[in-house]
Amino acid sequence: MKKKFLALALSLVMALSLAACGGSQEEAPAEEGGETPAVEEDGSDVITVGFAQVGHESDWRTASTKSAQDVFSAENGYELAFVDCDNDSAKQLEAVRNFIQQGVDYIIIDPIVSTGWDAVLTECEDAGIPVIVIDRTIDDSDKYVSWVGSDFKVEGLACGEWLKAYAADKGITEINALVIEGSTGASATIGRTEGFKEIADREGWNILASQTGDFTEAGGQEVMESYCQSYAGQFNVVICQNDNEAAGAMTAMDNAGVTYGVGGDVILVSFDANKPYVQMVMEGKINANFECNPMAAPTVAEIIQQLEAGETPEKEIYVTESWFAAEDNVATITVNGEEQPMVHVTQEVLDARPY
């Protein structure tokens, strides 16, 4: 009966979460760098969950946090201990160890970096607390129950395949690209970089430079300002590995008098596809945006229900994602032998976006 109640409640809250988790950072109820109180055991059948979140560096992260707080609510039979780790790996390890001491039932980790997890995951195992990893990946895959997230390399490959088709349609014969990477060591950075570089190497494109913007608007602006000085007049593509970096890059290019987007001198590509940036695609400011779905929490709740029922969940679960374009000249792309649609952004498409 409890499982049926949880399933019904979760279906309702997912609808509310999808409607409410758009890109503004003001929407997340947790304070920046903050945490929720420790869980308290009261002998009830409430499921206690600890969530060690990366931080609050982007609109995507805000949507991810909001989704978890909506799903793992008291109304749904959960008590959530949430820690914003502020992009501090040591703080994240400490948060997980605190969850162990609190005796939570489950631990969710969105890892800041992929390495250095063996010891603390062993401690989770010894305490009998299942760990579920979301978004970014962890190298010690035998020490957690399930991972839920995106195929970051496929995102990078999709970006490259779209750029190839778009350039061919526009008669662009030479690609000179600048890349603003995400946080160093993050699996999203690694996957998107590897995927795009694979296509760039295959096509003989010139990647002029690739530097980290740390997934932040300030970082994206700083790197792009440097690029505009060092590579003035030499580049025709800018790849930003998340939306916030793209916002910073646009500010830098505006200040430098560089035009971008549809009809501009520079093709601008982003990742994440938060709703405000999908609107920028519709407006032609961003040429293409490759979604990274932040809504892992409902799937994590399903995994927890499976574990509560004594079932074995899948080890890897990929969330559904879409690719968005400002123009309709490239209808489909082929990624790893699979034909995938490019969604031409219209007002109807934008209105349907949940975040």
Listing of model-derived features with the role each one plays in the protein:
Residues 48-75, 80-98, 104, 110-114, ...:
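Extracytoplasmic "Venus flytrap"
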Residues 60-74, 78, 155-162, 187-205, ...:
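Short, solvent-exposed amphipathic alpha-helices that sit
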Residues 82-84, 139-165, 210, 283-294:
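Short beta-strand elements at the ligand-binding edges of bilobed clamshell
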